[in-house]
């Protein structure tokens, strides 16, 4: 199973995502609550998958996604955001995200996207 970095500014959402991942046998190796921290933690941990919110303080998730992809073009990033507008989904995919999960979500949808991102 995969080593995962979970990034969201809401502690509750980090727990929801972490619990869903753990229930499927994945290991949450780190968490971050800002886009800036996400980039630093990615460099430090080199996870197999990163889940990333868009709306966060200091640096938004799309900026963090672009920076992570510049560091590691093979990075596997899954966007988990309440901003489900088509334009945000398209921008995320163009920047390199493997999939986009709209919050609120069912654990099954998250795990389906995780499987797709890791395939």
What residue ranges belong to the model's regions?
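Receiver (REC) domain active-site loop signature in two-component systems and cognate sites
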Residues: 56
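Active-site beta3 strand of CheY-like receiver
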Residues: 45-51
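Acidic catalytic/metal-coordinating carboxylates
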Residues: 34-37, 60-63
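C-terminal output helix
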Residues: 87, 105-114
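Short, conserved "switch-loop" micro-motifs in signal-transduction and mechanochemical regulators
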Residues: 83-84
